[in-house]
């Protein structure tokens, strides 16, 4: 099988295309490690600041233990045209009360299921990117974004 030939891409467009894709895709996949076993699941970010992604979770969920043991994670965003953004990063717990309240106020789903920002089960992770890559269609080549 030959390698697909994607449309030509101006390198100066890559950062904006990557940001647009992150804004468009509602449910990226989050990869963590469970010991030596990779785990992958869809997540619904509760806030996005460029390539900094915030994910809410419950402390009782498996990914909480996985992230506690290994903070290295990767998010993969893919649209219907198979364009991808991969954000490799470090997950850190958000303790900033003002930021938590902003996230809470903007997310009715959190409010509905958890009742209060002070719910002891709530944990919010900030994914600090260490690497961001973009792939156009099925080109099989990534462009470095960050």
What are these regions (language model features)?
Residues 37:
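Phosphate-coordination/substrate-recognition cap region in phosphate-metabolizing enzymes
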Residues 2-10, 84-146:
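Charged, gly/pro-rich active-site loop segments
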Residues 25, 70, 107:
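Acidic-histidine catalytic/liganding microenvironments
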Residues 46-80:
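A short mixed-secondary-structure module that forms the rim of ligand-binding clefts
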Residues 20-34, 73-77:
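A short, Trp-centered hydrophobic/proline-enriched beta-strand micro-motif
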Residues 1-27:
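Extreme N-terminal tail/first-helix region
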Residues 29, 52-54, 74, 86, ...:
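General beta-strand recognition
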Residues 42-44:
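Conserved beta-strand in the GNAT
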């Amino acid at each position: 099988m030959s390698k697909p030939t994607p449309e030509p891409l101006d390198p100066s467009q890559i950062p904006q295309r990557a940001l647009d894709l992150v804004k468009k895709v509602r449910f990226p996949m989050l990869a963590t490690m469970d010991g030596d076993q990779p785990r992958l699941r869809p997540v619904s970010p509760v806030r996005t600041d460029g390539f900094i992604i915030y994910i809410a979770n419950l402390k009782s969920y498996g990914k909480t233990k996985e992230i506690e043991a290994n903070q290295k994670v990767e998010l993969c965003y893919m649209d219907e045209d198979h364009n991808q953004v991969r954000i490799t990063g470090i997950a850190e717990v958000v303790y900033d009360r003002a930021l938590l309240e902003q996230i809470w106020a903007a997310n009715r789903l959190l409010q509905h299921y958890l009742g209060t920002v002070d719910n002891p089960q709530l944990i919010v992770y900030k994914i600090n990117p260490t690497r961001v890559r973009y792939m156009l269609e099925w080109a099989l080549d990534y462009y470095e974004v960050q």
